[in-house]
Each structure stands twice: as C-alpha cells, then as structure tokens.
Design a protein with these regions (language model features):
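DEDD superfamily 3′-5′ metal-dependent exonuclease/proofreading module
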Residues: 1-250
Length: 250
C-alpha cells in the first residue's frame, strides 16, 4: 500500500481570507497538479472558472487515497482546505485519521520544528527545494502559474522521498539534550518508532551519513491494531523512556 503524498500552495495563512492556488498529488505511478486560481485582467489572484469541478476532483483524490502524507499536512494543509473549501467535518476527520505527517513525527522526536529542506539536507538527498511558501505567494501574485505548479509538485515528490525512508536522520532536539545531557548516549541510537495503520518508521537523533540511510518504508501489518497513525511507541519501552515521552512538546 503506497503513500499518497500531496501539498498545497496558498495566497496567505488565513483560510477565511486567502485562496488555495494550486495542489499537487504524488504517488510512484502518478503525479497530478490542480490549479484553483488565476490572474484577472488587473493582475489580481481570483478563483479559476472551473473551480468547483477541480476542487471536487482534488478532494475525491484525498477521499480515495489509502494513506495521506503531507509535510505539516495535519497542522496546515488539511485545516486550510477544510475552511477554504468548506469541507464537511466528517470528511475532514477521515483525512486526519489516515494521515501520516512526517513533520509532526519529527517535531515529537526533537521538540522543535524545521523545514522540509532541512530533512532533505540531513538525509543525503541530491536535490533541494527551490523556494519557500513565501515565494509561492509571490509567484501567485506575479502570475507565474507554471513555476508555482512546478514548485508545488516538487514539494509533493520530496515529501514522498522523505516519508518512504526506513531510517530518517533528524537534528538533535532541545528536549533530548535537556533530559539526557548528564549521561552518555549514542547520538545515532534509535529512540522510538512512529506506528501507522500500515507502516512504521524509526527515527534517529543526530545527523547520519548518507550511507546509513536505508530506503524503503516497510509494511508492518502486525502493528495495525495499535491505534491512529500518530501513535508513538518506544522501541525499548522502559519506564524512563515512557516518562520522557510524556514530557515531549505536543
């Protein structure tokens, strides 16, 4: 069962006032970009003429996907489209329940936030993002729709590349240093794994050489009963580690 990776670009951060401009969907076998906005004669960003048809086609893809994966999808992308596209709450909840959010998992692991570009650099990828969300806003205002679509599509692809790594290097988080700075520990030791409905991914604290990154997010059918895609379990569930996990920033 493959991940369905996706990303959106917007004209700002307030879904009640701003627009979704483009959305990209990526699987190993198919890539789709939806454009929801265009420039009018005065250069203003407005909804495209067939907005409703494209919106429903995109939302249906989210409905049909077995597992959704977006970088900060549960924190930004899903809430934004839920409001901007006026989506039924039950439909939104189904998306949340089947979402695998590598950003949220990394934040729990380190107690900090960082960009997709940071993860790409730490894990030895030969590619990098060519812009940021702020750049995407400027591209829309400048009417650079082709460039914006390409940028969004690349984000969705990179999210797939990051999300399908068996081992993922993360920058060491403040929460771990504060909790364990008085004892020796291996910076490359596997600390915990994130268990999803069909997958598990092991996170390592500390920067790993590229050779240590093992591709392939392996199916783990024996753990499908453990709960939602965001449930985190210790590989070595000692009382000390269980207590530490409770103190992690949410």
């Amino acid at each position: 069962m493959s991940l369905f990776c996706w990303d959106i670009e917007t004209t700002g951060f307030n879904p009640k006032k701003e627009l979704v401009t483009v959305a990209a969907c990526y699987t190993p076998h198919r890539q789709t970009v939806y454009q929801f906005a265009e420039s009018d004669l005065r250069g203003n960003v407005v909804k495209i003429h067939d907005f409703i048809e494209k919106r429903e086609a995109f939302l249906t893809e989210l409905d049909d996907a077995p597992i959704l994966a977006a970088f900060n999808g549960t924190g930004f992308d899903i809430p934004f489209i839920a409001t901007a596209f006026e989506v039924d709450p039950t439909r939104v909840m189904r998306w949340m329940m089947k979402s695998f959010d590598i950003f949220e998992a990394a934040k729990r692991a380190t107690g900090r936030t960082f960009s997709l570009n940071t993860l790409i650099g730490l894990n030895g990828f030969n590619t990098a993002k060519t812009g940021s969300g702020a750049d995407a806003v400027l591209q829309a205002k400048a009417g650079k729709w082709k460039e914006l679509a390409s940028y969004c599509a690349e984000d969705a692809r990179l999210t797939y590349e990051i999300s399908t790594r068996k081992r993922l290097a993360l920058p060491e988080g403040y929460a771990w240093r504060k909790k364990h700075n008085d004892r020796d520990h291996d910076p490359n030791k596997v600390l915990f794994m994130l268990v999803g409905s069909s997958y598990q991914i092991e996170f390592e604290i500390g920067t790993l050489p590229a050779a240590s990154v093992i591709p392939g997010l392996l199916p783990n059918p024996n753990m499908s009963h453990l709960g939602s895609p965001h449930e985190v379990l210790w590989e070595d569930p000692t009382p000390e580690r269980q207590h530490y996990f409770k103190d992690l920033p949410q």
